[in-house]
């Protein structure tokens, strides 16, 4: 390459434009140990290549790959406001792997995308540490990702996150809701809080109520209740699949119970939910009161204490409850499947 720079003007570098290659390399080195501790035996190469290599696990007759991608929404804004970055990576993994387990798939590997205006290696390393923790909880490998430093696109060291995960399921064992029938039992698994949904409304409530984030809510500061990481249900549910026939699963994310349960129901079925069958967690009561939020809006925005819904036959319900309890869960029967009449909604919330 011929040097065409002018001796009369300063020599510009990528760093002058706001991109610090050395900081990016430093982050990669710090990430390697995180990736190493999540490594499954099927991973064929370490970090740093152009693409991650992953061998399909043995023991499948007709393996089907299942993929998903997600983010954590405006929970990120609250994380930045509170300068708490160590658990947001768990949220990112949870949002992806919990979607995969709904189809019966075991998560295999995970990749992340981290975009920022100015790379703070310390903040990014905290985020990736959380991603590694999430991958360990889900039993999948962190095999790579992308860190994009884009000055002018984001303010300062503000950042955005996206995750991508691939899982595997035996074709004959795909869970798609097609077996759901009248009389089936619906079991709820508790959430840890709002998880990663509804945070635009949460932030609005905080704003209009001039909330004190150190206020006690259910025995912990409000800031902790709102930043509690999303639960990862993967290992418990994989064990349940080996124990009995699970007909459908619904990950209760944005849209709440009313929008997510219909995604796994046949057209002729409805879910009747008894809202008195579980305890409404204090953080949701606080949000509803401070924001004067209607019941209907609560149930279509937040998980309201139910992070995952499991559909099993009535004959298997007691065994499922017992198994989940022995596994350390706190399951509760929240309703049943009934025939859908013309003009009815697929989720009926009974709030007696």
Curated annotation (Swiss-Prot):
GO terms for biological process: 'de novo' IMP biosynthetic process; adenine biosynthetic process. It is found in: Cytoplasm. Its main location: cytoplasm. GO terms for molecular function: ATP binding; phosphoribosylamine-glycine ligase activity; phosphoribosylformylglycinamidine cyclo-ligase activity. One of its GO terms (cellular component) is cytosol. SUPFAM superfamilies: PurM C-terminal domain-like, PurM N-terminal domain-like. Pathway: Purine metabolism; IMP biosynthesis via de novo pathway; 5-amino-1-(5-phospho-D-ribosyl)imidazole from N(2)-formyl-N(1)-(5-phospho-D-ribosyl)glycinamide: step 2/2. Keywords: ATP-binding, Cytoplasm, Ligase, Nucleotide-binding, Purine biosynthesis. Belongs to the AIR synthase family. This is Phosphoribosylformylglycinamidine cyclo-ligase. It comes from Teredinibacter turnerae (strain ATCC 39867 / T7901). The lineage of its organism: Bacteria, Pseudomonadati, Pseudomonadota, Gammaproteobacteria, Cellvibrionales.
